[in-house]
Amino acid sequence: MATLQFVLGSASFDHQQVMLDRLAAQYQQAPNDTYLYLVPNHVKFTTEVAVLKGLKKRLKQTGNYAQANVAVLSFSRLGWFLCKDDPDYQKPRLSNVGMAMVVAKIIRELKAESPDLLKMFRGESERQGFATEVTKQLVELQNANIQPADLAPDQETGIIKRALASQAGGGRASQSTVFTDKMTVLYEIYRRFEAAVTTHVTAPDRSAMLLNHLEAADLSTTHVYLDRFAGEFSAQEQLIVDALIQRAADTTVSLILDRDYRGRELPSQNNLYYRSAKQYQDLLNLATQQVGVDVLDPIVLNQPNQRRVSDALVGVEEWMEADARFALPDRLPAPTDQVGFFTAPTRVAELNRVATKIRQLVATGQYRYRDFLVVTRHLDGYQTMLEPIFSRHQIPVFNDNQRPMATSPLATFTAALFKVLKDYYQEADVMELLKTGLLVPETPEELQQEGRAKRNPNTFMTAVYRTENYCLKFGKGGRSWFDERPWRLEGEQPESDALKRQNAQINWVKNYIKDELAPALADLQTATTGRELATKFYQFLLDQGVRHQLYSWAHQAQESGQLTQLRDVQQIWQTFGTLLDEYVTILGDQVAPTEQPGQLVAEFADLMNAGFNAGRYAQIPSTLDQVLVSESGMIQDNQRKVLFIMGATDDVMPEVKASEGLLSDPDRELLKRGLNDDQFLPISGTDQINNEPFLNYLSMLSVTERLYMSAPLMSSDDSELTLSPYLKGLARHFNQWDDQNNAPTTDLPDRPNPRASEDDVWSFVAAPAVTMGNLIEVERLSKDTGRKLTSAWRDVARALTRYDEGLTGRLNDIRDGQYAKNEAVPLQPELAARLYTTNRQGQVTNQLTASISQLEKFYQNPYDYFLRYGLHLKKRDELEVSSDKSGTLNHDALAFFVQSVIDEPDLQLADLVKEEHQGRQAELIDQAFEQAMNQQEELRELAANNSRVNLQLQVAKQLITTMAKTLCLQATQTDAQPVAVEKAFGQADWTGESQAAELPALTFDLTGAGLGEGAKVSLRGRIDRLDELKLGEQTYQLVVDYKSYNKAFDLVDAYAGQALQMLAYLNALQAANPGKQLLGSLYLRLYVPTVDAGKEGTAEELKEHLYQGITINDDAVLAALDHGLGEKGATLLSIKKKSKKDTSRFKVSADDQFSAKAGSNLVSPTDLKRLMDHNAELIKEAAVQILQGQNEIRPYRRQVGTTAETGLAFSDFLDVSRFDQALDDYKEIELTDADVEAKFEQEEE
């Protein structure tokens, strides 16, 4: 007769030792019998080691010990152990990855055949990973012993009908509809899935085969032990357990239970042991209902000497038991160092403290790294920081949380490859493919480097990055890859060697896509069956060297001892092979539809992606002596000594959340009502929440000696976190809670303190690198606060240098870094001369040739000037119509338009307003835009490659049209006439080519500034438009500068150097034409204003384009410049009639008729000359400082109203200069208009 016996006891007792005692005793009596020790798969390996070790000791064996008749197995491994010779068991197995692939295919078919069927999941079904979720749901149904036929919605006696009938009259019609729709979808997918995999064996199939084997086999000499199964079995596992109990000679089951519940009612659901008690009674009832099973009295563990944990952990158990009953046990009389609690500001700080404590405990000599277990409810929040932090602490760590394969290079490569094909070679897809590093074509001869292989990944990747920049700049992609003409980077002519190499790089990549990759991908589309497609794809990977590159990575990992990376490469290639095998076996005979030639490839791509999304890396420890990191919801072996529970916050300890998956908690509860007795789903909803204390309890008692709980106070998004009630309650129970501060009394300080005691300092002593970082931090704090370091810190410093003499140098270097400031070292004048005065022939001169805007940049921030014009840094070009490009286009178009009018003697701008000249006006505008576009072929190429850029050019055409018409309208309101456009000065000094109409450079002698003989500064520039106003015998010159924004003439900026342009233009004009009078400089904003319908081309529109700037204050000149300054008001100038409150020296006209509005200034010819002289001094001062090597990181700052303007506003090099705004090291501009006025008045005195 078969027997059943239970080993009962709470988690603090040593169940395994009792099980091993019984196993050893039985083995001595019947050594030839078979002994099966079943445990959860997660702890199989460690349990096997412990069982063999325990048997060796009990059987008094010496030397190496093995057992042929004792097997430690999981349920899945038990199937192989007993059924490996069964022919059906030898059928091809369908992995989880293969299952996901089949499900993905079914979902794709349903979308095509019955799109309304998936309406419940219409949005989700398009999401990556949906097939994996559906697969998990199907596996759950299979494990619950639910067959597709059971879910048929129209079956009167089926599960669905029974479930719906159970809630009849409950007023839940909407839930019933949603439930029915979901189950209909699942039924259809499940039904098709079962039909599709008949030639394969799935995991549930193997369980069914195992059950059949058990029911037929002779197990009279088999002894079964079940250990570590907490809570409940799945439906299929339960059937297997029932068969084992009935058929085996004897079965021993270990359960975590506080007492024997035979003949008793189950405890309340909030009892800590409720799930175990229910499992106990379920097994008892099943056994008693079977003939031939004798239930023996249980072995109840309740003696102190049977415990496996320390007294401190027994205290943890007592508190958890009481807390589950809503009781409050007495506090323990005195604190213990075997249980500790602490908080940290962030997860990073928390993990650092955990690592520090582990390191310190190992240093005592009482522990090895393998004695530590670190858990948290979910590792997601710590995943990216685990390895870096433990590595810094020099702690070997093994993370047993399975990592997904979806982000592996091969998975990314496969997804990107088929996306390239699907979306026709878009730049982002091509770059994602190439950046995986798996494609390494042969290097062209002109790019080969001595000592490098013909196929060099680094050489190719450099070319890929260069090509990406080119594509982003010019909008390349799609058909551009197949251009017959070579791509070209424009540059100096003739081409330099560097430019030739860059052009060779981008064409190498382009030609590889065009000549190698594209034909190979096109060949994939010729496949007529799934088998042929899989074969072609595999051959493609071989031909393109993908497998070779993976093997190369594996070899590098092996050479460097990176065993995890080595196994990752091996596993991903093995998974890929499994995917192809299962695809060919199941779908290999699928024929490509002739009416949709790309469908076979598209489906193959979807299935491969679904397969990789379902794939997980198998985790294998690289060494035995490692800290184990896991999740608290998983069963752990009980061999480790010290536990750290991280992330102990109230959102996860206990965790209250809905079940994951396609079925919601209400769906699951409703489905359970229709199940048969031999069918049941995993617990969910309220049952799962009620079981949370038990899961946390098992985690806390999974070690033998110490428990530490920690929590971060802030999440990764800086939201505040609340401590877990378990942490608070246990800390109070162990007299380690400070109610006044609402924190553990054993909490560690957030940062090192210079005056810390030896105990506090100890909490910051860890691995050398970490300890050194803490020491440097506290030394800096000591310096900043003036508090001296305690002797404990000085002892740490001495210990570090004694530990490793090499640390002394590093420590001193870092200490020196504390006093380092982010200051640029001034250039030597010789180096400055080489950087700034080298001409186009490569000769170092003593002449600074620059543009006015460059000197403005120097006044805004000298270091930015050095980076841009000394080192010639520039930001990465991207696909955009930048402000520079659009500004040039607008300026060129208006220049062509105005110049065309100037070139026609009988035509003036004002004439084009007349009706008879409207056609001519439109013709000139079109010609001007076309001529401007001809000057920027780059923009044409951008527009041809990108619809967004094309739209931007259409907007630019509208702007140019509006502004050309505005210029014509403005010409009717003034006596001034344009005489030149794009008037250049100093360009010959820069290009070496003189132009007949060009003005000489604006040049200043710098002799006497300590720069040597012949030192000078030569400025170049280009005046957008030059107007002349003739009044009597006098000719006045007026500078017009176009701006894309509302630019005002700021007197302070002009006086301080931030705005040199307009006065410098006047200086250049005066130097070239001293006989002509200067009228001033004006800005005109280029934009399309919003004007009421019917008011286009009227004075209303003119007022939207008023000029702002600086002009002389002669009333007669102003009236001639703007005819509207009479009764009707200004139509061109930002000027108004003077009021009594207008008294500023720079705002009022000479005869007190007019005053300037904000953004404009009216000055006397004398004051204009003073401003121009000051402008010249600013130019010379900037030039002298530049040539003397001045390059300090000191941007200007000026408060304008409520806004602080700084020299950082438009910098492209913030990451290079690393200016710390918190240090406030700006060059403050505190001048006001009144201050400038006061300076002028002082000069007059």
Swiss-Prot record:
Family matches, as Gene3D superfamilies: P-loop containing nucleotide triphosphate hydrolases
GO biological process, one term: double-strand break repair via homologous recombination
First-level EC class: hydrolase
Family the UniProt entry places it in: Belongs to the helicase family. AddB/RexB type 2 subfamily.
PANTHER family found in the cross-reference section: RECBCD ENZYME SUBUNIT RECC
Note: Despite having helicase-like domains, this subunit does not have helicase activity.
UniProt-recorded name of the protein: ATP-dependent helicase/deoxyribonuclease subunit B
Organism: Limosilactobacillus fermentum (strain NBRC 3956 / LMG 18251)
